[in-house]
Each structure stands twice: as structure tokens, then as C-alpha cells.
């Protein structure tokens, strides 16, 4: 289909004759262009043809209201632009349907305008009335470069002589893809959820009665605080002080003791403030609880870590980084400082070319050299996104035949080894990482109660259901069973309440 005057004659449209052009001035293009530069800006007003404006205004005034549009450019032989329809441009031609108003376009896949053929159902689908193309032939209208269509779950075969791109779990063969690895989810797999019909004043009264007079009703405290979300427990704190003019935390400290008291007080802190005091406790005194620092920094979200850093400065008038530097050293210190920035990439897209480059750099920094370039491991493991690093770990296994965790164990030692392993395990499977930590806390003689309390409380509203499932899968026994056998008294009762059930 063509229009009168289009396409242009050979050689293009001729320039307008000098002088008297419909827009004023001496035609276009000008015989010479002014030089470009700052020295030319001052004279710009003088270079601009003022007649353009007057000519434009004169012609625009006659454009609307049904007036004829001037022939701005010489037309090709055989005619110029078609004449303006009667009534101006405001109305469609008699044979044309009016454009539907805003919001009234037919939905995708709907019926086309009258007289038009129906649309294909998808890119590459045959036009109605046309036969399907032969097998192996690109359907007309398909997007260029697309592989031939296959059934769901079937991979298209590459052209002859081309090797298929290796596949990864949850990844396709494109260079930039969105993997099937879900981002870390928070707040939807916990054993403790917000209680329905919550009344903070009523709960404050229950707690007041439980601690009033001779003796303490520990079971009432367990039933109340063990079945409220953290947000609801903060409201109970405020309501208790409003109703009785007393600090609930001080009353709990005076009435409770031991690990039961520690667990209840942990429940009463906000998640961020709880971590702040756990970190402070880990670096206090002569020794350092490196495992606690690793666990917190390797498993928390960017947002949580940034809030933690601000809260630490508020509570102790010292930055979190200063606290880390004062109590750690070497590459382990650098690892913790990197993680404490809360600056990990949160993208869910994966660039496979970057994945392969990172794999090569990790291999060159460790297995493929004498000694280890720890800084390269630090840079990649602390900054790349979770989705990207899962792809890196899979590709590392494929290219080297060795799991990344085993390479870390071969190349590093001590706290740095444990820190790097924790990062990898959290990225691969966070619930499994915590299931292992819980099992180690209860394994053998004695119980690491701080670790047990910290994990049970901090994960109770996040992913404790998933941790329970991983624990059963990894150790053949339920978490509930092992807590029952390793603790006692009210301490056991509150932990089992948080656990939420037997598997």
C-alpha cells in the first residue's frame, strides 16, 4: 500500500527554494551550518531566522477548523498529500470506525475491528485461514532468533554443529535470566503468628496476675507471651506500663530466673535490638563468640543489618564496624565488616557470563594456585546476589568437579573457614544451616543454650517451620524430640511452645 507522494523520487525530496518558504527563511537545509561551541552561544539569537516564527504562526492558524494545510514540501510526481477531509481532522473518514474512548480498547486477544482479520493468539501462531508451516520451518510472524516451538518441559534442539548450552537447576540457556530460585522470604514460615482478637490490656492483666503475690504462674506467662507476635508483645509492654505504671521487663526479671528468664526476655526485645545485644555479648570480655557473629551477619537481610548498625550506634555510642575491628583481625575481620555493610546485591536476574567469570576467578584464587587469595572469595561471596551465587556454586561444581564448600575447607582454616562456609550454606539453604546449628547446640555433653535460644527466638516468625522440616530430613528425628530430651522445666516448655509442634 502506498500514499500519493510516497515514497520519494530518486535522490530524495529537493530542498525548498531559497526565500519565501512556507515557514519563512531561505529553505532547508541551510547552505552552511553554524559552528558548534560555547563561543557561538552568545550570537545564537542573531543566527536564528525570526521569519520562521511568523511563517509558522501564519500557517498553523490555517491548519485547524477545516482549512487546507499548505503544501510544505514539493510532492513527488503524481500528487501530494491527500486533501483534508470535510470537517477537518477532528472526524474520521466515513468508512473508518471512530477510535474508542480511553479505557475502551478491546482486551488482548479480543475481537479486532470490523472488517479486519482476527489476531494470532501468540507470536508465531498462524494467521486465521493460513495453514501451519512444515515441521522445522520458522512460523511466519515469530520473533526473530526464537527457537522452534516445543511442548512444555521440552528443550529445543540447537542447530546442527552447535553445542547445547549446559543447563543448571532452575536456569535456562540465555545469558541473562531470572532463575527459579525464590528470594529469601521473611515472615511467612514462622511458628508464631499474630494472635487473633488480640487485646494488649487484657494480656497485661494476665501477666500482672501471674506475677502478683506469692509465687509465679510460669505457665500463664508461657501461654501468653509464647503465642503473641513480636509486634503484639511490644504493645503489651506499653499497655502494662500504662495500666500499672510499672516496667514489665523489670517485673519479669525479678520473678523469673535461668534460661527460662533469658528466653522470655529474648522474646520481649524487637528482632533488631535482640541481635544488637547478642553481638555485644559475643564480643564482650576476653573471648569472642565468633560463631554468633558469623550466624547473625551471614543470615540477616540487608535491611535488618542496616537497622542493626543504626541501633548499635544508638545503644552503645560506638559503630558496629568499630566494635568488629576492636575484637577481630585479619581476613575474618574483613569478612565480618563486608557482611555488616548490608549491601549485598538483591537482584533476582542472573548473567551467566558473569557467573562463569566468577567461577574462574574463585578457582584461580583457590584450587588453581599455591596459597589462597582470600580477598577474591570475600569480594564475590559478600557482594553478589543470592540467585547469582547459587548459580556460581552449581557452575563451580560442574567445571571443577568439587563442591565449593570442600574447596573452602581445603583452602582456609579457623574462623575465616567457618565464616565463609556459613555464608555459602545460608545462600544455598538457610533453614538447613540453622538446623545444623541447632543440632550442634544440643549434641554431646552440655547444651549451648545461648545458641539454642537465639535461633529459636530469632527464627520463630520467619522460617522455623522450614527449619523443623530440614532438621527431620537431616537427622531423622524431630526438633521437638531433641529439645524435649535436652532441656527441662519451664525452659523446655517455652522452647517447645516456640517450636510449635512435633514432626
From Swiss-Prot:
Domain notes: A pair of annexin repeats may form one binding site for calcium and phospholipid.
Modified residues (N6-acetyllysine): 246, 253, 477
GO-annotated molecular function: calcium ion binding; calcium-dependent phospholipid binding; calcium-dependent protein binding; phosphatidylethanolamine binding; S100 protein binding
Subunit annotation: Interacts with S100A6. Interacts with PDCD6 in a calcium-dependent manner. Interacts with KIF23 during cytokinesis.
Main location class: cytoplasm
Locations listed in the record: Cytoplasm; Melanosome; Nucleus envelope; Nucleus, Nucleoplasm
GO biological process: cytokinetic process; phagocytosis; response to calcium ion
Annexin repeat extents: 198-269, 270-341, 353-425, 429-500
Protein name: Annexin A11
Keywords: Acetylation, Annexin, Calcium, Calcium/phospholipid-binding, Cell cycle, Cell division, Cytoplasm, Cytoskeleton, Nucleus, Repeat
Keyword Nucleus: yes
PANTHER family: ANNEXIN, ANNEXIN A11
Annotated disulfide bonds: none
Composition bias, Pro residues: 80-117, 123-167
Family: Belongs to the annexin family.
Region listing for Disordered, in residue ranges: 80-172
Physiological role: Required for midbody formation and completion of the terminal phase of cytokinesis. Binds specifically to calcyclin in a calcium-dependent manner.
Signal peptide start-end: none
GO cellular component: azurophil granule; collagen-containing extracellular matrix; cytoplasm; cytosol; melanosome; midbody; nuclear envelope; nucleoplasm
Stored InterPro entries: Annexin, Annexin_repeat, Annexin_repeat_CS, Annexin_sf, ANX11
Amino acid at each position: 500500500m502506498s500514499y500519493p507522494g510516497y515514497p520519494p523520487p530518486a535522490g530524495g525530496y529537493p530542498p525548498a527554494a531559497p526565500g519565501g518558504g512556507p515557514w519563512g527563511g531561505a529553505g532547508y537545509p541551510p547552505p552552511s551550518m553554524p559552528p558548534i561551541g560555547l563561543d557561538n552561544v552568545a550570537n545564537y539569537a542573531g543566527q536564528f531566522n525570526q521569519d520562521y516564527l511568523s511563517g509558522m504562526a501564519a500557517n498553523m492558524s490555517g491548519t485547524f477548523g477545516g482549512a487546507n494545510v499548505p503544501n510544505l514540501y514539493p510532492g513527488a510526481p503524481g500528487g501530494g498529500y491527500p486533501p483534508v477531509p470535510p470537517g477537518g481532522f477532528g472526524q474520521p473518514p466515513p468508512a473508518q470506525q471512530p477510535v474508542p474512548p480511553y479505557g475502551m480498547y478491546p482486551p488482548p486477544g479480543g475481537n479486532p475491528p470490523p472488517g479486519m482479520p482476527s489476531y494470532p493468539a501468540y507470536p508465531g501462531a498462524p494467521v486465521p485461514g493460513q495453514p501451519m508451516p512444515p515441521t522445522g520451518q520458522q512460523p511466519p510472524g515469530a520473533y526473530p532468533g526464537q527457537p522452534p516451538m516445543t511442548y512444555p518441559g521440552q528443550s529445543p534442539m540447537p542447530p546442527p554443529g552447535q553445542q547445547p548450552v549446559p543447563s543448571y537447576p532452575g536456569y535456562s540457556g540465555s545469558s541473562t535470566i531470572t532463575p527459579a530460585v525464590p528470594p529469601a522470604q521473611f515472615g511467612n514460615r514462622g511458628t508464631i503468628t499474630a494472635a487473633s482478637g488480640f487485646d494488649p490490656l487484657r494480656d497485661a492483666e494476665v501477666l500482672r496476675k501471674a506475677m502478683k503475690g506469692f509465687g509465679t504462674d510460669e505457665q500463664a506467662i508461657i501461654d501468653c507471651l509464647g503465642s503473641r507476635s513480636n509486634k503484639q508483645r511490644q504493645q503489651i509492654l506499653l499497655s502494662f506500663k500504662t495500666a500499672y505504671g510499672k516496667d514489665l521487663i523489670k517485673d519479669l526479671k525479678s520473678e523469673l530466673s535461668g534460661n527460662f528468664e533469658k528466653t522470655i526476655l529474648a522474646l520481649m526485645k524487637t528482632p533488631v535490638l535482640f541481635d544488637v545485644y547478642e553481638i555485644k555479648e559475643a564480643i564482650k570480655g576476653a573471648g569472642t563468640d565468633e560463631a554468633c557473629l558469623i550466624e547473625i551477619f551471614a543470615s540477616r537481610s540487608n535491611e535488618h543489618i542496616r537497622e542493626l548498625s543504626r541501633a548499635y550506634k544508638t545503644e552503645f555510642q560506638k559503630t558496629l564496624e568499630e566494635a568488629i575491628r576492636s575484637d577481630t583481625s585479619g581476613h575474618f575481620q574483613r569478612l565480618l565488616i563486608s557482611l555488616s555493610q548490608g549491601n549485598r546485591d538483591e537482584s533476582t536476574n542472573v548473567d551467566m557470563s558473569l557467573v562463569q567469570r566468577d567461577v574462574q576467578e574463585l578457582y584461580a584464587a583457590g584450587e588453581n594456585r599455591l596459597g589462597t587469595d582470600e580477598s577474591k572469595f570475600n569480594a564475590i561471596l559478600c557482594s553478589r546476589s543470592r540467585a547469582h551465587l547459587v548459580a556460581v556454586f552449581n557452575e563451580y561444581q560442574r567445571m571443577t568437579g568439587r563442591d565449593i564448600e570442600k574447596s573452602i575447607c581445603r583452602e582456609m582454616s579457623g574462623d575465616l573457614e567457618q565464616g565463609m562456609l556459613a555464608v555459602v550454606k545460608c545462600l544455598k539453604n538457610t533453614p538447613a544451616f540453622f538446623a545444623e546449628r541447632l543440632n550442634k547446640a544440643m549434641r554431646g555433653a552440655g547444651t549451648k543454650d545461648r545458641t539454642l535460644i537465639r535461633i529459636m527466638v530469632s527464627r520463630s516468625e520467619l522460617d522455623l517451620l522450614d527449619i523443623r522440616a530440614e532438621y527431620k530430613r537431616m537427622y531423622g528425628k524431630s526438633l521437638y524430640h531433641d529439645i524435649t530430651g535436652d532441656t527441662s522445666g519451664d525452659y523446655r516448655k517455652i522452647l517447645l511452645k516456640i517450636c510449635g509442634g512435633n514432626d
